[in-house]
């Protein structure tokens, strides 16, 4: 129970990652039998079609699979990375055929909006919808709620800290109206910032059909680090499509 199992599990993940994809986009499953697995590092699920699966999600490792994250006091880390963390550049604000959104306010739940010129876009295009952080927007949200509570500048949100980026597929183009496959979930209001779209030039960096199933995750804790210096992310999901975490308890 004392040994670090990070490399053992990672080796199995890497091995399954070499398998060919089947007709449903799955390579295979890494099955962790019931028991406790100490994880001192980060498990990287970075292959299309690889699933990490346990044999139960109860607290006890007698009849369930328990991933036990250690060294939480020494460093903040990710226990599991799903996807491709290096693919964040799809939302960096740069891409092909950039054009402004002219709809004055795109509301949460909306699937469509008008742009200045949609002639470069077709159904099936992978795009980024970008809403940059501006001083006007930060003032409207009280710099993250901090201006009312304290004057500590270090705690205030800053421009470019939290730009809003949506990863979407174009489903319809009609004139200068563009419809996408999933709704907007934060209002894009032109009075605070100019939203725009562009084509994502590296869609191959997006991972598909990555899963974690049926296991329990726990962390090493002590009275000294029970409320501070804890792991920042238990499961960090980045640049994924059609991927899932189900039957996982913590």
What kind of feature is each model-predicted range?
Residues 2-7, 51-110, 117, 179-195, ...:
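Right-handed parallel beta-helix/beta-spiral solenoid domain characteristic of secreted/periplasmic
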Residues 121-135, 186-210:
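Extended Gly/Ser/Thr-rich low-complexity repeat segments
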Residues 32, 51-55, 121-124, 211-212, ...:
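All-beta strand scaffolds that present successive hydrophobic residues in beta-strands
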Residues 118-121, 171-177, 206-209:
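A short, structured loop/turn motif at beta-sheet edges
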Residues 133-167, 171-177, 213-250:
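Right-handed parallel beta-helix
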């Amino acid at each position: 129970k004392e040994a670090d199992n990070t490399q053992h599990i990672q080796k199995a993940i890497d091995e399954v990652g070499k398998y060919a994809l089947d007709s449903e986009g799955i390579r295979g499953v890494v099955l962790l039998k019931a028991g406790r697995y100490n994880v001192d590092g980060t498990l990287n699920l970075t292959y299309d079609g690889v699933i990490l699966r346990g044999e139960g999600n109860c607290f006890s490792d007698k009849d369930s699979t328990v991933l036990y994250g250690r060294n939480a006091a020494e460093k903040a880390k990710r226990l599991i990375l799903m996807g491709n963390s290096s693919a964040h550049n799809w939302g960096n604000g740069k891409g092909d055929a950039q054009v402004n959104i002219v709809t004055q306010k795109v509301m949460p739940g909306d699937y469509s909006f008008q742009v200045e010129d949609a002639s470069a876009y077709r159904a099936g295009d992978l795009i980024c919808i970008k809403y940059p952080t501006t001083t006007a927007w930060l003032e409207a949200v009280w710099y993250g709620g901090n201006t009312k509570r304290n004057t500590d500048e270090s705690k205030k949100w800053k421009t470019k800290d939290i730009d809003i980026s949506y990863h979407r597929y174009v489903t319809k183009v009609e004139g200068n109206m563009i419809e996408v496959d999933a709704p907007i979930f934060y209002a894009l209001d032109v009075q605070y910032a100019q939203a725009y779209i562009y084509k994502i030039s590296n869609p191959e960096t997006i991972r598909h059909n990555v899963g974690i199933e049926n296991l329990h995750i726990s962390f090493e804790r002590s009275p000294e680090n029970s409320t501070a210096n804890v792991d920042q992310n238990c499961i960090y999901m980045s640049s994924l499509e059609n991927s899932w975490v189900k039957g996982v308890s913590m």
